[in-house]
Amino acid sequence: MKIKAVAIFLSLLMIISLFSGCVENEKPIKEGSNDFKLIPVNSKSNFEEFKNTVENSIGNYIYVGHSYASREVQITSTVKSSNVETSTEPERFSKTNVQVKGVDEADILKTNGNIIAFSQNKIYLIKPLPPKYAKIIKNISECGYLYLTNNTLIVISWNKITSYNVSNPEMPKIIWQMDLNGSYVDSRLYNGTLYLVVRKNSIDCPIVWNNYKIGYDKYYIPELPPIYSMDFDTTYIISRINIKSGKVENSIAIVGNYKTTLYMSKNNLYFAYNLKINEKKLMLNFLNESADKYFPTEVADKIKRVIENEDFGDNAKFVEITETIERYLSSLPSEKRHNLMKKLQNDFENYLEEHWEEFEYTGIAKINLDSFEVKSGKVSGHLLNNFAMDEYNGYLRVATTIGDWRFRDKMTNNIYILDSDLNVVGKLTGLEKGERIYAVRFMGDKAYIVTYKETDPLLVIDLKNPKNPKVLGELKIPGYSTYLHPIGNNLFIGIGKDDDGKLKISLFNISDLNNPKEVDKYKLNVWWSPAFRDYHAFLWDEKYKIFFLPAYNHAYVFKVEDNKIEMVKDDEHKTNVLRALFINNYLYTFSLSEMHILDENNWQLVKKIEFENYLPYGYGFK
């Protein structure tokens, strides 16, 4: 009977195990307020108290990060000058595909029209004009993410940032260099200023980062609702750096966890991270509120006494209550046990539905670009990526999904609108239950969201009234898009997969917001494109109405005309294609091993340049 009871009890544990991890030694945690906010720690004693709370919560899984010294950079010449060249200035050139026009983002390919910088196993400086005589003129023996503004090339490698003067690209000169003293997370470049986020896998204060002291007044810690986990093991350093001098002009630190998202407008930097519910506490709260419904008085009273005992942490309470329930179940006849289990499961699912918006949060820090003043707020759910946040007319719009693979049928999608103080003033919740967001794009006072389960709903959402967002239209088609790109004339392109898993390009017409349409589509017999996860791989050329899409060793070029998608060029390389750019009327496509130059008027190959000793498995930091 005991064995059989334990076996039946395992089904109850299946419910509970959805909301629990490994049992760790845990002391009682001092709870925060009933809301999320970031506050400066302000004193050593406050910091030590916070650090002890975190260490007790996550089982001391904190380690001290390392600082890496810079290595010497070698700059080598590769090609001598040729007398057949003629000097020419570009009429137009492409910029990196970014989220916010005018706010640059780091990538592996950059141009200012006169030179191209391509980061692979090394940084290649290429003279692109005239196209027939294009050549590699310098190699820099490092690699990383790049910015190229006027004649300044910034390289963010795995352990440092280096700024080069490339006014004479045959003789680039180092202007300044600094150690990252942590791991690179993300960055933006705006108005001659670099905004940088670095992660340190430790919690420590005060911090001196590149001679800038971050004291207790600039070290921000979270205050959380009691039911949320204190799983913080990381410090994020957010800095403003003058790109001319390399001077750190301002810097703050925020304690967070590993999953973060960065979005920057021209006024504010938004730094968001996922806040997970303490899943044991959720179950304990359910039992504390409902134990009288399922158990006799002595069992229910014991459960409540254990929960209310402040001498034990949640893990210890969870173990004791589990054993108490197991003993009670062992005493019941089989049918009664089964009925009780079924009722517990049904009631807990209803409880979860009632508290669904509390299941997970995204904490958001808003950092003013000028003053570095910090404000904070929260929304329910988690973000897909940086396109899930957008600032417009003083409001922050956020798209989230609540739930994960364990709750596929319960997942919901939401839009939240926050004011300048990050208070929620409007929301639209419960969208497309059982699906999750695959793509989102905010454009003006509208949002376009793609969710997916079996079909691809494209939702058009009106955000004109921030306090009352509403769905205007919906389109359901097979497959899904992971990236949406507006191309004007009420059209945008969706890059994703069809229902058979093959790459699909959709052309959407949103001239009738109440009735969006997929006016054309194009399928490729491939499974993957870098643009699925990295929108920097996508390029739109407005002059020729063409877009570039890489897939494996192919650089595909498509033209959009008369609501139709037409492939105009399949530029095949020897290795995986990564990026493209245009200068004047020429398209430059880049793979791991070579660069091709195509004439956009006839799509003929004008020039091919090979890269030596390329990385066979892709680019990366040394």
From Swiss-Prot:
Keyword Signal: yes
Signal peptide: 1-20
Protein keywords: Signal
One Pfam family of this chain: Beta_propel
Source domain of life: Archaea
Name of this protein: Uncharacterized protein MJ1554
